[in-house]
UniProtKB/Swiss-Prot annotation:
Active site: 2 (nucleophile)
Recorded superkingdom: Bacteria
Location of the Glutamine amidotransferase type-2 domain: 2-234
Organism: Pseudomonas aeruginosa (strain ATCC 15692 / DSM 22644 / CIP 104116 / JCM 14847 / LMG 12228 / 1C / PRS 101 / PAO1)
Entries under Pfam families matching the protein: GATase_6, Pribosyltran
Protein name: Amidophosphoribosyltransferase
GO cellular component: cytoplasm
Catalytic activity: 5-phospho-beta-D-ribosylamine + L-glutamate + diphosphate = 5-phospho-alpha-D-ribose 1-diphosphate + L-glutamine + H2O
């Protein structure tokens, strides 16, 4: 999971890019990068760390130019090496930099094609560098000194023909402008908007609408599946459908966990979707246990708060904040490595005994993935004096790996894989476990008149929308990307890139 942003402005965009990445920090805390363009020269700064740590004053002063792109990263493919921080760069044609959110499922085939047919070299294990080289090659074969929007859209069409998976991309073509595009299934989110200044109109492309809001941009719309937007350095905007058979199937887990609640994705309010998740959970509890003895509903900060509030309201039960969060600790789900996650939970949360002592407590979380967080939190609730500890997941059981850019690649690291609800309840130490039903989740997110064909719910139902994911592929990525393998692969690769200081 990553966050991307691109801006075409009328003055230096370094501060705006920095601010946008800070707003998107929840999408990745492993690395950050910004590249800008001024007088056909590129200025890059990227490294491991949070946005505030990667960019010091001296770096910001060097990032000059009215056009630029940025990225925050959590690694799902490749490694956590700073060599794989984005944006990536290739010098031919034109000098192209690229930032990518998602994951390609045919990356091995593409890497082979790039080397044997396109005669290009890829220096890292990142599928983002592969995607960049595919785009660069398809633009190079147009053989134009000055590429037009038609050339750029033709190159994006070829990317769609060759690349399979979920991807949202923003790329900067030196001296020309920025291009954003979305995979033909619209799995990963991307939006664009504009703001009016005294010097003219400025444009932004970003992963989430909240980045536009905070910086004073007006949301124009989401990119459609397979669509591309090209904005020239002069501020001319072009859009084009570049996929042959687009299908609207965005990832439903964005609404469950990944996105900020104040974002609008594909015309859907994330906040409103989470309110409805709480309503659906309450209805299920009232159906299955109309005589429940829940005394208080307590959310696990922060994502579950919206659903928990509506759950309590619909049940007619008190809602209380029972945990104090240390806001200087990152999100545990997107922390590399199980050991880091376990250590982080106790550092991040502390129970308020007053809210637990002698009560039947219903804890609410957005989802249960590995079970690391909820198991420790349930134990904390018991230590704080809870009489009974019940647990509610606003999402259905996560039973299958995600292959489109979320860090759930290994099925055997998912606590619900091949286990019943009762099994999971025992493993996490809950007296009662309630999962959201998948039809209810789909209705909560997509209820009403929306343009979506269907959601990608692969982590819940094992149905992968790209149609190329089989057992052999899942076994291969499990071996390549489980926590044990990641721990062994953190050797630092050489950085072959722009001067980076």
């Amino acid at each position: 999971m990553c966050g991307i942003v691109g801006i075409v402005g009328k003055s230096n965009v370094n501060q705006a890019l920095y601010d946008a990445l800070t707003v998107l920090q929840h999408r990745g805390q492993d690395a950050a990068g910004i590249v800008t363009c001024h007088d056909d020269k590129l200025y890059l700064r990227k490294d491991n760390g949070l946005v505030r740590d990667v960019f010091q004053q001296r770096h910001m002063q060097r990032l000059i130019g009215s056009v630029g792109i940025g990225h925050v990263r959590y690694p799902t493919a490749g490694s956590s090496s700073s060599a794989e921080a984005q944006p990536f760069y290739v010098n031919s044609p034109y000098g192209i930099t690229l930032a990518h959110n998602g994951n390609l499922t045919n990356v091995e085939q593409l890497a082979k094609e790039i080397y044997e047919s396109d005669l290009r070299h890829v220096n890292t294990n990142s599928d983002s560098e592969v995607l960049l080289n595919v785009f660069a090659h398809e633009l190079a074969v147009r053989n134009k000194l000055q590429p037009t929007e038609e050339d750029i859209f033709a190159a994006v069409s070829c990317v769609h023909d060759r690349c399979v998976g979920g991807y949202a991309v923003v790329a900067m073509i030196t001296g020309h402008g920025i291009v954003g595009f979305r995979d033909p299934n619209a799995i990963r989110p991307i939006v664009f908007g504009q703001r009016h200044t005294e010097n003219g109109v400025e444009y932004m492309i970003a992963s989430e609408s909240v980045a536009l809001d905070v910086l004073g941009f007006t949301l124009i719309r989401d990119l459609a599946p397979g669509e591309a937007v090209y904005i020239t350095e002069e501020g001319k905007l072009y859009t084009r459908q570049c996929a042959k058979a687009p299908k609207y199937a965005p990832c439903i887990f964005e609404h469950v966990y990944l996105a900020r609640p104040d974002s609008i994705m594909d015309g859907i309010s994330v906040y409103k979707a989470r309110l409805r998740m709480g309503e659906k959970l309450a209805d299920k509890i009232l159906r299955e246990r109309p005589d429940h003895d829940i005394d208080v509903v307590i959310p696990i900060p922060d994502t579950s708060r919206t659903a928990a509030l509506e759950l309590a309201n619909r049940l007619g039960v008190k809602f209380r904040e029972g945990f104090v969060k240390n806001r200087y600790i990152g999100r545990t789900f997107i922390m590399p490595g199980q050991a880091a996650r376990k250590k982080s939970v106790r550092q991040k949360l502390n129970a308020i005994e007053l809210e637990f002592r002698g009560k039947n407590v219903m804890l609410v979380d957005d989802s249960i993935v590995r079970g690391t967080t909820c198991k420790q939190i349930i134990q904390m609730a018991r230590e704080a004096g809870a009489k009974n500890v019940y647990f509610c997941s606003a999402a259905p059981a996560v039973r299958y790996p995600n292959v489109y850019g979320i860090d759930m690649p290994s099925a055997h690291e998912l606590i619900a894989h091949n286990r019943s609800t009762e099994d999971v309840s025992k493993l996490i130490g809950a007296d009662w476990l309630v999962y959201q039903d998948l039809p209810d989740l789909i209705d909560a997110v997509g209820g009403g008149k929306i343009k979506i064909d269907h959601f990608d719910c692969a982590v819940f139902d094992g149905e992968y929308v790209t149609g190329d994911v089989n057992e052999a592929y899942l076994n291969r990525i499990e071996q390549a990307r489980n926590d044990a393998t990641k721990a062994k692969s953190q050797a630092v690769s050489a950085i072959i890139d722009l001067y980076n200081d």
